[in-house]
């Protein structure tokens, strides 16, 4: 038995909660209104995504191959040469024997650039470093191939678009992989620095007193140290590596976040809603990270793109001085050092310079747009 709904009454429908608050929508609109920063953001994301799939753009292995009816993915799986009738060794897909064997029993799809960052080009027309292929005539660029201009290996994918370095490695491939390492290193360092710096600043600003005094004196002493010299000394002692450099630079990079977060917590810790939360028995850590931290993150977010660009610049500087990534790693700093040592090959320094300039300019434009978006005094139409 069911009760009939009384006449004249309406069922109340709970309104749907919007995905974003009006403040967030206003900030996003302000960010989009800054056209230079908005398009720089998307251009940077596209370049970063392309660098993440660098193995499918620049590689000395085919993306996809078919051999005797079997589909192979050499770019992701290492197949021994024995599979193609050779020896039990790593397969060199650029050798004529392997290419003839696969083409006779199937097909191969190569990436646009048939070189990885560590592939040595043995068909350069003269001693390395060699110029980009478009600075040579057709006869010169194919002179190292057995059949010259008629050789099937002298194709656009096998030519060096931006030349080679002093070890006959493709500059374009090293630029793409170097861009990826620089951005990944900068992002990882920025996120780790933000976690440490925000936590330290929150503790200082919320508790105040002796906690704030002691930590502030420590930070003043720590930040007054010659960072670059200490980085060089530690990097010279420890074996080079991605995570070794990350740990070394994290020792000092977190300090930049402390002052901003500390000031926000000092300002907000005596607000009425904080006092009410304390009176209700809410714990200090809950108040800090659930109620105060969102307000402090506004200033922190505007600071992140500039910290990211600074992290990339520091890594490039260490690589340039020879204290960065391990030898052979794709590095923009190492490419700049090669350009300095090979002034007769200006394409080395110019490639690294323009890559760094574009990357840092995009990050600065994005940082300016984020800063304007979170500024309540600015409203764009």
UniProtKB/Swiss-Prot annotation:
Membrane association type: Multi-pass membrane protein
Keywords, ordered alphabetically: Cell inner membrane, Cell membrane, Membrane, Peptide transport, Protein transport, Transmembrane, Transmembrane helix, Transport
Biological process according to GO: microcin transport; peptide transport; protein transport; transmembrane transport
Coiled coil residues, start to end: none
Stretches that traverse the bilayer: 38-58, 183-203, 230-250, 292-312, 347-367
GO cellular component: plasma membrane
Subcellular location as annotated: Cell inner membrane
Residue stretches making up the ABC transmembrane type-1 domain: 179-371
Matching Pfam families: BPD_transp_1, OppC_N
InterPro entries: MetI-like, MetI-like_sf, OppC_N
UniProt signal peptide: none
Effects seen without this gene: The deletion mutant is hypersensitive to ampicillin, in a manner only partly dependent on the beta-lactamase AmpC. Deletion of the yejABEF operon leads to the accumulation of anhydromuramyl tri-, tetra- and pentapeptides in large quantities in the extracellular milieu. The yejABEF mutant displays cell swelling and lysis as well as a severe growth defect.
CDD domains attached to this UniProt entry: TM_PBP2
Family note: Belongs to the binding-protein-dependent transport system permease family.
Self-association and partners: The complex is composed of one ATP-binding protein (YejF), two transmembrane proteins (YejB and YejE) and a solute-binding protein (YepA or YejA).
Protein function: Part of the ABC transporter complex YejBEF-YepA involved in the uptake of muropeptides, the breakdown products of cell wall peptidoglycan. The import of muropeptides into the cell enables peptidoglycan recycling, which is vital for cell wall integrity in this bacterium. Is also probably part of the ABC transporter complex YejABEF, which is likely involved in broad-spectrum peptide import. Responsible for the translocation of the substrate across the membrane.
Name of the protein this chain belongs to: Peptidoglycan transport system permease protein YejE
């Amino acid at each position: 038995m069911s009760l009939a709904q009384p006449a004249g009454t309406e069922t109340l429908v709970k309104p749907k909660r919007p995905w974003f608050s009006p403040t967030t929508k206003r900030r996003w609109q302000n960010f989009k209104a800054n056209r230079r920063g908005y398009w720089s953001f998307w251009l940077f994301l596209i370049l970063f995504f392309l660098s993440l799939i660098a193995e499918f753009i620049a590689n000395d292995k085919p993306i996809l191959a078919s051999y005797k009816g079997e589909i192979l993915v050499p770019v992701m799986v290492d197949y021994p040469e024995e599979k193609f009738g050779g020896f039990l060794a790593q397969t060199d897909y650029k050798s004529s024997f392997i290419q003839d064997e696969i083409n006779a029993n199937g097909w191969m799809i190569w990436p646009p650039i048939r070189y990885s960052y560590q592939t040595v080009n043995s068909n350069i027309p003269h001693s390395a470093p060699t110029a980009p292929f478009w600075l040579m005539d057709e006869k010169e660029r194919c002179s190292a191939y057995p059949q010259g201009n008629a050789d099937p290996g002298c194709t656009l994918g096998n030519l060096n678009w931006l030349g080679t370095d002093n070890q006959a490695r493709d500059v374009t491939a090293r630029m793409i992989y170097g861009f990826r390492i620089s951005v990944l290193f900068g992002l990882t360092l920025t996120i780790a620095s933000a976690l440490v710096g925000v936590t330290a600043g929150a503790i200082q600003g919320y508790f105040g007193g002796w906690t704030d005094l002691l930590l502030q004196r420590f930070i003043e002493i720590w930040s007054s140290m010659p960072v670059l010299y200490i980085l060089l000394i530690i990097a010279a002692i420890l074996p080079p590596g991605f995570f070794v450099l990350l740990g070394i630079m994290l020792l000092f990079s977190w300090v930049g976040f402390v002052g901003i977060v500390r000031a926000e917590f000092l300002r907000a810790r005596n607000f009425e809603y904080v006092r009410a939360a304390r009176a209700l028995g809410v714990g200090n850590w809950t108040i800090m990270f659930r109620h105060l931290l969102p307000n402090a993150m506004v200033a922190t977010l505007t600071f992140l793109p500039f910290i990211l660009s600074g992290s990339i610049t520091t890594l490039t500087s260490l690589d340039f001085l020879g204290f960065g990534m391990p030898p052979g790693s794709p590095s923009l700093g190492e490419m700049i050092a090669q350009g300095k040592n090979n002034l007769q090959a200006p394409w080395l320094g110019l490639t690294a310079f323009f890559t760094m300039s574009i990357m840092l300019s995009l990050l600065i434009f994005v940082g300016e747009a984020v800063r304007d978006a979170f500024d309540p005094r600015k409203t764009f139409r």
